[in-house]
Structures are given as C-alpha cells and as structure tokens.
Amino acid sequence: MATVLFVKANNRPAEQAVSVKLYEAFLANYKEANPNDTVVELDLYKEELPYVGVDMINGTFKVGKGFDLTEEEAKAVAVADKYLNQFLEADKVVFGFPLWNLTIPAVLHTYIDYLNRAGKTFKYTPEGPVGLIGDKKIALLNARGGVYSEGPAAEVEMAVKYVASMMGFFGATNMETVVIEGHNQFPDKAEEIIAAGLEEAAKVASKF
C-alpha cells in the first residue's frame, strides 16, 4: 500500500479546462488500478496559501538554526510545515496544472515555495545543493492550448519546465510527464488531441 498525494492547481470546471480533465482521468484510472492505496487530494484553490514573505523566510531560517521564533514567524512556518510534511510523507505525488501566461498558477508556485526547505527536500554540500527525495515517484500532468514542445514557443514554456526543475532540484529521479497540447491551436483536431492525451494518462496512471 502506498500513500499518493494528488495536487490540483486549477479551479475551473472540467468542461472548461483540459488540465482538469487530464487530472480527473489520471485520478480515476489510478484508483481503479490501485484500490488499496491511500489517495489524498489537495485542491490548492481551496487552501489558504499566503505568499512567502519576511515571517516565513525568517521563521524557516530560525527553525534551521534552532533560534526562537516570533508569534508571526511561528504561524507562517506552521503553514509551510503542514504542506511540506504532507508532501514528504507521500510515496507518490501527482501534480495537475495548466500553462497560464507561459507559467504555472500562482497557487502552485506558492505551494512549491513551501516545499523548498534546506534539510528537508535538499541539503547544502561543499559541491552544491543535493536533493533528498530521490525515491519519491512524481507525475506531472499539464495541458496547454498551444504547442510548446517544439518550435519557437518551446523556449518560453515555463510550466512543466519549472515544476520538473524543482522536483529535480529536490532529487526526484522517477518522474512521469503527460502533456496535452495544441487543442486550441488546432481546433479541428481538438477532440482527437484531447482523447489521445487522456488515453496516455490512463496508461501511465495504471502503471504509476
């Protein structure tokens, strides 16, 4: 039995959002293939996720050094710790997110900021930072209306690149990625593109 954390970063309904369709398809197929696993769903738009600021930065630094925290710092660290510990305790983590304005939704960026903790997800060494979550399985589920996997737009895709880079920085070595793209760029092929992506999601989910 494994504990699997599903992180959803889009609050649009499925009929309006291909990334939500992708997320829901992966979730349903995973549950069907792994009925005994513990599945935890985290909808970031239903959470209170304050931006990282002075209290959280100073608080997490003080925690690492064993210093006393102010009341405000302690509250900020407690918020980050809640999500960090949940992430660390999961055997597998699935991220479902769109590409908006070339990058990820702000709630997902903030959530990943909470995970970025020296001594927890990575450590400093004389040779540079080393990730600490190498045995955790990660799946990235992304949808984008245009084509960003190749051509001139590839350089400006900062959604999958960012999340994959952060998970790599944390030491993840077992990552799966499912992307649906081009359904807005090629509306006459949209149904075919989306159907193929959902089929791929089902295959990956059944083996994840």
From Swiss-Prot:
Entry's EC annotation: 1.6.5.-, 1.7.1.17
Cofactors that this protein relies on: FMN
Annotated GO MF terms: electron transfer activity; FMN binding; oxidoreductase activity, acting on NAD(P)H as acceptor; oxidoreductase activity, acting on NAD(P)H, quinone or similar compound as acceptor
Keywords: Flavoprotein, FMN, NAD, Oxidoreductase
Catalytic reaction annotation: 2 a quinone + NADH + H(+) = 2 a 1,4-benzosemiquinone + NAD(+); N,N-dimethyl-1,4-phenylenediamine + anthranilate + 2 NAD(+) = 2-(4-dimethylaminophenyl)diazenylbenzoate + 2 NADH + 2 H(+)
InterPro entries per UniProt: Flavodoxin_fold, Flavoprotein-like_sf, FMN-dep_NADH:Q_OxRdtase_AzoR1, NADH:quinone_OxRdtase_FMN_depd
Top-level taxon of the source organism: Bacteria
Cofactor note: Binds 1 FMN per subunit.
Family: Belongs to the azoreductase type 1 family.
Alphabetized NCBIfam families for the sequence: PRK13556.1 (NF010075)
Subunit structure: Homodimer.
Function, in words: Quinone reductase that provides resistance to thiol-specific stress caused by electrophilic quinones. Also exhibits azoreductase activity. Catalyzes the reductive cleavage of the azo bond in aromatic azo compounds to the corresponding amines.
Protein name: FMN-dependent NADH:quinone oxidoreductase 3
Organism expressing this protein natively: Bacillus cereus (strain ATCC 14579 / DSM 31 / CCUG 7414 / JCM 2152 / NBRC 15305 / NCIMB 9373 / NCTC 2599 / NRRL B-3711)
Annotated gene: azoR3
